[in-house]
Each structure stands twice: as C-alpha cells, then as structure tokens.
C-alpha cells in the first residue's frame, strides 16, 4: 500500500493498521469460504467459485431452494471467545445422539425431588444471554430464520462443522 503526503497527515497509524488488518482478514475469509463452499445441483456436487457479480445470484438461488449454509468454525476459536465460554455452551466435535432436555422438569430424576439442595448466589456472567429456545418445549428443525431474544431477525444455520474439514 502506497500513500501520498496528503494521506499521511489525515490518518493515524493505528487506524491504518486496523484497516489493513481488516482487509487481510476479509481476504482470508473470502478465500476460505470460496474453497469450502460446495453446491449440490441435480444430485451432483460441484464446487462453486463466485465472481464479483455472482454472490447476489447465488444468494437468490439459495433462498429459492431453501438452502441452509454450512459454516465451518474452528473449536479453538470458540473456546477463546469469552461470550462462548459459559455453562450453557459446550463445543464438542461429536454429534449428539438426541437433543438435550429443554427444561429440567422433562428429566425423570428431577420429578421425584426428594432431596433438598442448598441455593447460593454464584456469579453467572453471561448465563441465559445466548439462549436458543426460551418458550418452546419442542425442537424445530425446518426453520431457516428466527427472531432472537432481543427481537432481531437471525439466520438459523443448518449445520456447523467444527475442526479441520
């Protein structure tokens, strides 16, 4: 990157470094997504390479076909983020055999409630902030979008791959 003497006076070094870092990360992310994206059309799996004009066309096809994107996430990246290190979020490489019970009352052990447990205040930093299912007691698997607990429209991912693929 070259800059003229006029540009050097208007931008601080920190903002320029931040801008360059953002450009590098965006380029790496774009290349990684292009390499990992596989499209299935008419039963034949092909690797899609998008040009600058194609992303809107591909996105429109995905919406019409009901395609849910598959996002690859590194497990170590999730462990490093503080907001994902809560007792309600567990990153695991193995697929669960069945969905976890949504409420404690669904578990037969809790229904007996013969022993009394002492309650004490513990610092629960982000507990419940990233709840997926708050009022439903059944799993919904055919949704591609939903409304989160703050009222924002969000995309529901069909599958998340963790680790090297």
Curated annotation (Swiss-Prot):
InterPro entries documented for this protein? Cystine-knot_cytokine, Nerve_growth_factor-like, Nerve_growth_factor-rel, NTF3_N
Q: Which residues form the propeptide?
A: 4-119
| Entry's localization field | Secreted
Q: Which Pfam families match?
A: NGF, NTF3_N
Domain of life, source organism = Eukaryota
Q: Keywords, A to Z?
A: Cleavage on pair of basic residues, Growth factor, Secreted, Signal
Name a single GO biological process: modulation of chemical synaptic transmission
GO CC, alphabetical: axon; dendrite; extracellular space; synaptic vesicle
Signal peptide stretch: 1-3
**GO: which molecular function terms?**
growth factor activity; nerve growth factor receptor binding
Q: Which family does it belong to?
A: Belongs to the NGF-beta family.
Q: What does this protein do?
A: Seems to promote the survival of visceral and proprioceptive sensory neurons.
Specify the protein name.
Neurotrophin-3
**Source species, please?**
Tropidophis haetianus
């Amino acid at each position: 990157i070259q800059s003229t003497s006029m540009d050097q006076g208007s931008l601080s070094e920190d903002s320029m470094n931040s801008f360059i870092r953002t450009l590098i990360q965006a380029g790496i992310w774009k290349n990684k997504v292009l390499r990992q994206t596989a499209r299935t059309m008419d039963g034949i799996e092909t690797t899609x390479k998008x040009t600058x004009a194609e992303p809107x066309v591909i996105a429109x096809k995905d919406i019409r076909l009901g395609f849910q994107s598959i996002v690859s996430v590194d497990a170590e990246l999730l462990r490093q983020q503080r907001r994902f290190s809560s007792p309600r979020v567990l990153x695991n490489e193995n697929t669960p055999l069945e969905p976890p019970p949504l409420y404690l009352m669904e578990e037969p052990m809790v229904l007996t409630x013969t022993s009394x447990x002492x309650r004490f205040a513990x610092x629960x930093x982000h507990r419940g902030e990233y709840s997926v299912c708050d009022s439903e007691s059944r799993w919904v698997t055919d949704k591609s979008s939903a409304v989160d607990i703050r009222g924002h429209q969000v995309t529901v991912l069909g599958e998340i791959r963790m680790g090297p693929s």
